Amino acid sequence: IDEFLGKGYPMTNMDTGEPLRSIRERILSANAYLGAFPLAEALRTGAGVVVSGRCADAALALAPAIYTYGWRPEDYDLLASGMVAGHVIECGAQVTGGNSLANWRSLANLEEIGYPIVEMQPDGSFVVTKHPGSGGRVDSHGVKEQLVYEIGDPRAYYGPDCVTDFTSVRLADDGPDRVRVTRAAGAAPTDFLKLSINYSAGWKAVGTLVYTSPFAREKAQEAD
């Protein structure tokens, strides 16, 4: 960190614009969000288990596709497909009904909700599904809701391997509990990486569960 600051990089807080120097003496840890290619290289060398530092969530899904299909750093549309796939499944059961408000009354067996599976193709198209017989549901409504989860500008979702345009993506139901995802578009990544920093600033613990209208009370009672 001191080396980058010494070279003149401002390293400002992406929410407040506050310079890093203002908290430098209180920093406890710092982790850059790395991309998928080092993970794919580990797979290429025969690793059965890959232990990584902090990487982008979607890199965990993108790396196996890079390794399996030989995608290159300049294959931005393909990398964007992997980023979309990783983003869709990165929060587990959110995309199988755990975070879906569409037709929520008909979601079955949520206490045994299934976790998502991506069936990736060499051209970057993929199907989102789940294990047969597990609870929840995979449909285009749930995938759409997960697509816009924590992304900022949907036309420019920044990652270490590419910038993804989520507005280019097309969804189609592909049978029960199957959604096909196509046409992801990508562009070259920026010269920057996201840096997560923990620093000492006292402590606060807050827990919140939010249920949106309509029928917010009924949803909360159903979840109890």
Model-derived segments and their meaning:
Residues 165-224:
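C-terminal non-catalytic interaction/assembly regions of soluble proteins
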Residues 34-38, 45, 79-83, 138, ...:
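Conserved active-site and cofactor/substrate-binding residues in soluble primary-metabolism enzymes
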Residues 2-52:
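An acidic, phosphate/nucleotide-engaging active-site surface
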Residues 63-69, 121-130, 199-209:
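Short acidic (Asp/Glu) and glycine-rich catalytic loops that position anionic groups and cofactors
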Residues 56, 65-70, 146-148, 224:
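Short, solvent-exposed amphipathic alpha-helical segments in soluble enzyme
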Residues 54-60:
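Gly/Ser/Thr-rich loops at beta-strand to alpha-helix junctions
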Residues 4-10, 64-75:
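A glycine- and small-aliphatic-rich helix-loop capping segment at beta-alpha/alpha-beta transitions
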Residues 77-183:
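A conserved active-site cap/scaffold subdomain adjacent to cofactor or substrate pockets
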